[in-house]
Amino acid sequence: VNPDQTIRGNCIKFVQDMCELTSKLEAPNTYLRPGSINTNGPWLPHPENHTDKVFDRLVNSTKEIITVAENEGVMLSLEGGYVSPIFSAKRAKEFIDAVGSKNLGFNQDPVNFISSIEQAYNTREFLEEFFTLLGNHTLGAHLKDFTIIDTLLLRFEEEYIGSGMMDQAYFLKRMNEICPDAHILVEHIPRDKFEPSYHKTIEYSNAAGIKWESYK
């Protein structure tokens, strides 16, 4: 989404190359991350990130990438987050429709999109919008959690699985219903916290009636 054509062109070429590598590795898909106008990092806020101008630029960039993905037989898995140009379930659906390719899907990562008290305290309703609008496009998911920090100004932080506010059993249940063959990545867990997070994931999976396939 960078307005500098040289920088944007280099990024487009990088993702095109990733499509070719993904095909050679016979991997299921590769991520498409929207970026940011903020020069300090791709997952940081900027006043223009939610504008139609940046959205249209992202659509145009993706159309250049998607032809390579189609030729290579590779799926692109769209990521997003509230601070990014893909800031809601509705915006993600609008983006997928605008690009108009069967090779563009969606990675369910709802924690990235939490942006209000109402969403934080009603995560089932929040999750359901993503599954309703993007269920048919879902390729996989990231599993993590969040909490609200006790402070005057609204602030969210990631939390270890099992200690946060997301209804994980409902999330896994709906993932299993809409995309039973999905891969789900437990994300942003330090090594010393991985084992308890794993056990919590299994606990939520049992509550959701999910049996995981063995990885080979």
What residue spans do the PLM features occupy?
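Active-site acidic/histidine proton-transfer and metal-coordination neighborhood
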Residues: 1-105
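Histidine-acidic metal/acid-base catalytic patches
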Residues: 28, 59, 63, 71, ...
